Design a protein with these regions (language model features):
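Catalytic domains of riboflavin
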Residues: 1-3, 479
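Mid-to-C-terminal polyanion-binding domains and interfaces
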Residues: 70-74, 316-360, 412-570
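Residues at the C-termini of beta-strands that transition into short coil/loop
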Residues: 112, 188-190, 388, 570
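Active-site cavity-forming subdomains of large catalytic enzyme subunits
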Residues: 126-204, 208-217, 227, 244
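Short, well-ordered strand-loop elements centered on a beta-strand within folded domains, enriched
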Residues: 177-178, 184-185, 392-400, 523-526, ...
Length: 570
């Protein structure tokens, strides 16, 4: 059973509203997102990319720029080694375009998820040696590849790491000591001694910062960086970074530019998903466009997504966009099948009693493990790992809840795994099949999650009568966009709403349209998306219902009306 709680953060909402010309409700929503103080509120409402931190603040940036300046003058061969997810593909594209612009002799390699696995492996170093590569630049990987970086160094190569994943560490006398690979330069804001203020950048933004510094060194006009904002936005949302501070400003700017993008591949991907007339939001990146870019790395090769971004003609872009959209449809079907199998296993075994779920799906495509883990996490509100079978070992991904740092818990089980890495909220690993049961046992023995932490919470921003909703308020709520992790869509709530009328609509009969009446006699239209039959059965048994909701303006055939989107009910 969900626990509904009201955010009780205090401030003078009327004073903030007067100062910034916003409704006090909007001031309260901003405070609930921990935006405090005049400067932070101004940045939140109207911050621009011109105010973002200098790339030169990042540890090793000067060194990394010096290295490539020298290598370019020597006409040395540079290879970018990326990753097969949305962040890795966009990072690779940003570095490739940026380095080519300043005259580098550059090529790219994105590892194949199945054939190569994540990140740098020994055979990629050997291939680089065969191809007479002088310098390797990683993106969205490398921070945990100490042995492979050492191998490249032993072969005389220069290595620059650009990454954003957690830095490996070891415990010494109660303190964490970073275990860094022996690269010539490491750009990763998560290094303990890196002064860059935003530690929550995605890999593509780290790559973007590197290109920004290189452009400055090489005298490239700063306006040329503007084409990368939309890619930074796609990666930030697609890799589920917190939409706060710098990240939110970048995404806001990128979304504005995406509508009129000059990139033919993105134009055609937008068209293939029937979004050419839509206002593109973070939702469309996270749930429509982003999954298409990810789909090639999951079910085929991420080279297709990179080719889409590189497409030189409308025809090529349209073909690739169509292919990726079709692949994503296949991915959806396979994901649903895997999710249902995982739930069946959990419900039929003692797994259902675990606080940390570890589900082994030997026949599932390994690329779907993370998505399925996320669905399992949502259903059970517990940290979830999904492992799949491989040729020599099992591979898997985990998705966590706020109270459980997944990467730190994996460190405690490091001896059981072949390889692992990740963040507090997500992780990836490979493990011998014989160790899976012990892995599950140890994670649960170590788990300190309480019953309260395992109970889903619905945090209500403002208990607000529907009679307070106006068109002006709804328009002001849009000032808070883009919404996503770390800047969630506001949640309002009202008790004692009477249902005057309802009907199930939609092609899949999963939408309920309602007419509601509040205690003051004000009526409002409502929409509920989800398990329609369950919702209808619930309201039939009740004289009134309590709901959490989000208000919006319904525009239909030239008419506008206020309605609420019902999110939860009781």
């Amino acid at each position: 059973m969900e626990k509904w709680v009201i955010a009780a953060k205090r401030a003078d909402f009327n004073q903030i509203g007067q100062q910034f010309h916003i409704d006090p409700v909007i001031a309260r929503l901003i405070r609930n997102r921990d935006v405090i103080g005049e400067d932070k509120i101004r940045e939140y409402l109207s911050g621009t990319v011109q105010e973002l931190p200098s790339p030169w603040l990042m540890k090793d940036m000067e060194k990394a720029v010096d290295i490539l300046e020298k290598k370019i003058s020597q006409k040395a061969k540079v290879r970018i080694i990326g990753d097969y997810d949305i962040d890795g593909v966009t990072s690779t594209y940003i570095l490739m375009k940026g380095l080519a612009r300043i005259g580098a002799d550059v090529d790219t390699y994105i590892p194949d998820r199945v054939a190569d696995g994540y990140g740098i492996h020994a055979h990629l170093i050997e291939r680089a040696e065969t191809d007479r590569i002088d310098t390797i630049v990683t993106c969205d990987n490398g921070i945990a590849a100490a042995a492979e970086i050492q191998m490249a160094k032993d072969k005389g190569m220069t290595v620059i790491i650009t990454d954003h994943h957690e830095v490996p560490y070891r415990e010494e006398k109660g303190e964490r000591q970073m275990v860094l690979p022996p690269a010539d330069a490491i750009l990763n804001p998560k290094q303990y001694d890196c002064p860059y203020p935003n530690k929550n950048l995605c890999g593509a933004v780290v790559a973007f910062k590197y290109i920004a510094a290189l452009y400055e060194r090489f005298g490239v006009p700063a306006e040329e960086l503007e084409d990368y904002y939309e890619l930074a936005a796609i990666a930030t949302v697609g890799d589920v970074m917190d939409l706060q501070g710098e990240n939110r400003i970048l995404v806001k700017e990128g979304l504005c530019r995406l509508k009129n993008t000059k990139n033919q591949g993105l134009q055609e991907l937008i068209r293939a998903n029937s979004l050419e007339d839509a206002k593109i939001t973070a939702y469309h990146i996270g749930f429509v466009l982003g999954p298409c870019i990810n789909a090639s790395g999951r079910l085929d090769t991420a080279a297709r997504s990179l080719a889409l971004l590189n497409a030189k003609t409308k025809e090529e872009a349209a073909r690739l966009a169509g292919d990726l959209t079709a692949l994503n449809q296949s991915r959806k079907a396979l994901t649903e099948k895997g999710k249902e199998e995982a739930i069946r296993i959990i419900e039929a075994t003692e797994l259902k009693n675990d606080r940390v779920l570890v589900v082994y799906l030997p026949d599932c495509h390994e690329s779907l493990a993370g998505i399925i883990a996320g669905r399992i996490r949502e259903k059970y509100h517990r940290p979830a790992f999904v492992l799949t079978g491989g040729e020599t070992s099992a591979k898997g991904s985990g998705r966590s809840i706020e109270s459980y740092s997944m990467y730190e818990e994996l460190v405690k089980c490091a001896d059981l795994m072949i390889q692992f890495g990740g963040h507090p909220m997500a992780a990836g690993l490979s493990i011998e099949e014989k160790n899976i049961e012990e892995f599950r046992r140890r994670l649960n023995v170590n788990c300190m999650l309480t019953d309260e932490e395992l109970r889903p919470k619905i945090v209500i921003d403002v208990p607000m009568p529907v009679s307070y909703i106006t068109k002006e308020l709804v328009e002001q709520i849009s000032l808070l966009e883009p919404f996503g992790k770390g800047n969630t869509k506001p949640v309002f709530a009202q008790k004692n709403l009477r249902v005057l009328d309802h009907s199930i609509i939609g092609k899949n009969k999963n939408v309920v349209k309602l007419k509601l009446l509040d205690p003051q006699g004000i009526s409002v239209e409502g929409i509920y998306f989800g398990e329609a039959e369950d919702f209808v059965n619930f309201i039939r048994e009740k004289d009134s219902i309590s709901v959490t909701y989000y208000p919006e303006i319904n525009r239909f055939r030239g008419r506008e009306s206020l309605q609420i989107i019902i999110q939860n009910y009781c």
